[in-house]
Every structure is written in C-alpha cells, then in structure tokens.
Amino acid sequence: TEKQHVKLDTELLDKYIHYQCDIRDIGQIENIFSTYSSDIKLIIHTAAQPSHDWAAKEPQTDFTINANGTLNLLEATRKFCSDAVFIFTSTNKVYGDTPNFVPLIEMDKRWEIDPKVSMMSSLHISYGTSMAGVNENMTIDKSTHSIFGVGKVASDLMVQEYGKYFGLKTGVFRGGCLTGPAHSGAELHGFLSYLVLCAVNNKPYTIFGYKGKQVRDNIHSYDLINAFNFFYENPRCGEVYNM
C-alpha cells in the first residue's frame, strides 16, 4: 500500500528502492531485472490478485495477473539472474474443495482431523492428511477450485516446473490463514485481522459454518518469513511446502 511504501522510504532511505509496475508488463519487469542482473540474489513473489469475487467477475484479468504475471517473473529470473532463489507465495486454494471432504471430529473449541484418517491408506493418499495436518500429497485433481484457484494452480505448477525443468532454485509456499502486524483484513479474507477490527469498532462479526468453531490454523508473518529464510539458506529446485 502507499502507506507502507512511504514508511519504508522514510525508515530505510537509500536502502530501499520502490518500483511501481504491473507484473503483466514483461517490458517493465525485464527493465528492472536487467538493471540489477546477477546482483539479484532473492526474489520473493507476493504480487497477486487475491479476490475470489473479482476473479469470477473478471476471469481474464485474474488469470493474467496471477498466472501470466508469475510466468513473466520466472522468465526474467531465468534470463537475468538464474542463480537467484525464487520464492512464491501460493495458496491452499490449489487443492480446491478437497479439504472440505477430509473427515473431521468436533472438539470443545475447534474441529480436528479425524485420527482414523491416517490409518485409512486410500484417504491418506488422496487427502495427504494425518494428525500433524495436511501435507503436499493432497490431490489437486477432481475438485472445484474456483476461478481464482485455477489461476493460482497454474502459477504454482509453473514455479515448480521452472525449478525441475530449468534447474532454478524455486520454492512454493502454500499459505492458508496468514496474519501479522498491519494486516488489512476484510470480511472475505484476513479473518483474524477483520475480527479484531470489528471488536475494536464494536461492529457485528458474521461467522460462516462449523458452528462458529475454528477449523484452520493461523500462521504469523514472522514464522512465514522464517520459513522463507530457511529456504533461501538451503534452496532446492521446485520444492513445495504447505504452510
């Protein structure tokens, strides 16, 4: 946001350079990458169109930002700084509605994965679940992803492929409920931040499903950045991590 841009400019001075560009514009992207070339050591790709509703209304806009924009960044990395580490913030939406079919058991304050699921081999292969959570073996096939989800699947797979096919150091981090300082939450995403906003302003908060009990876990941005740093220090080609 503009507010964060001004804050970074003020606090970091000449250590921070801001470029306002559209990741769909390969010319703009290549101009930036060619300026710094092999001096670029790390790319953290967080640019995206995040709204499911907007994606359904403007599928072409959504796909060109999330899928084509990611491809532009990958190509620029391959062309100008192929030894750099490329980190992509993907989403659990690549799994579509498959997580909705994972057997859950109701606890006092939340829903947990049914322990029996890890003992059922057919479910374990399909769902990639255990009491520890959901791993990367969960299938992305035969599910309804939403228009937004399909664009993210395409970009997710492309980041993996550039790692495995071209040998780039690419890591895909599939986030779920992310939160942290200055999180601009809204009703349809960033629910924990939005819940606090409603509480502070004494506004009603609408709860959807599951009897108001928690299903998914939140992860703090501090922990996510730590995961990024671990990958940067020990990169691999085309790896995927559920966060």
Short names for language-model regions:
Residues 77, 163, 199, 231-232:
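Hydrophobic pocket-lining residues that define ligand/cofactor binding sites across diverse proteins
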Residues 34, 48, 200-201, 232-236:
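Residues at helix-coil transition
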Residues 140, 213-214:
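Catalytic Tyr-x(3-8)-Lys segment
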Residues 153, 166, 178-194, 203, ...:
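Glycine/proline-rich active-site loop of Rossmann-fold NAD(P)-dependent oxidoreductases
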Residues 1-176, 222:
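N-terminal Rossmann-like NAD(P)+-binding domain of SDR-like oxidoreductases, especially those catalyzing
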